[in-house]
Amino acid sequence: MKRLNKLVLYISFLILVISFTAGCGIGKEAEVKKSFEKTLSMYPIKNLEDLYDKEGYRDDEFDKNDKGTWIIGSEMVVQPKGERMKSKGMVLYMNRNTKTTTGKYIVSETLHDEDGRPKSKDKEYPVKMVDNKIIPTKGIKDENIKKEIENFKFFAQYGSFKDLSKYKDGDISYNPEVPSYSAKYQLTNDDYNVKQLRKRYKIPTNKAPKLLLKGSGDLKGSSVGYKDIEFTFVEKKGENTFFTDSLHLEPSEDK
């Protein structure tokens, strides 16, 4: 009888531990989603100049007279099997104090030196935004690059995360010492955002991507750190296809 009672107590304890662990996982997943929700709920931002009038997270790092600078970036990275990794993307710095925007369009290719070590070869094209149009600030001979810049759209302009709750049973990671956190979800090719990416980019795989929400800093909010989203289609040695996007407010350098 004593053995039976001990067995019952042991099983009850295991159930309690499993329930507690599962509860913590669900709670942390909700926290990660909430940390991204304020920014992602603004998507799509069709007119980027609307960001001049949008508030972001502020803390003691900001001067009281500083409205902050929005930093927005999108990049597509493709490496077919056995080939070089190539990427194209853009980053803009949108100063809310002066309502001016500058940035750069970046074309990158990963090469290898004589010892086989990877080395990135980047070409940067300075840009500015006027009347919601992105234009080069220097002459560009390559007409294809010029068109890519003029037609460039950030994911924040067409992506949609109106209902983060639809993403469930994610792979959650949290390290309070760094601190860093992430949530990963398997998507389908029927997902709205996946369709939008395939519409705009030549993605050399039919595999449905995983959505990764990753960040660093205080989960409740911080101007120090980052919050990125990534759509990973392929991730293996010598073959990669992924898209990254970020939007966050930082203290302005002119303050």
Curated annotation (Swiss-Prot):
A lipid is attached at C24 (N-palmitoyl cysteine). One of its GO terms (cellular component) is plasma membrane. It comes from the Bacteria. It holds the Pfam family DUF576. It is found in: Cell membrane. Keywords: Cell membrane, Lipoprotein, Membrane, Palmitate, Signal. Residues 1-23 form the signal peptide. Its main location: membrane. A lipid is attached at C24 (S-diacylglycerol cysteine). Belongs to the staphylococcal tandem lipoprotein family. This is Uncharacterized lipoprotein SAOUHSC_00055. It comes from Staphylococcus aureus (strain NCTC 8325 / PS 47).
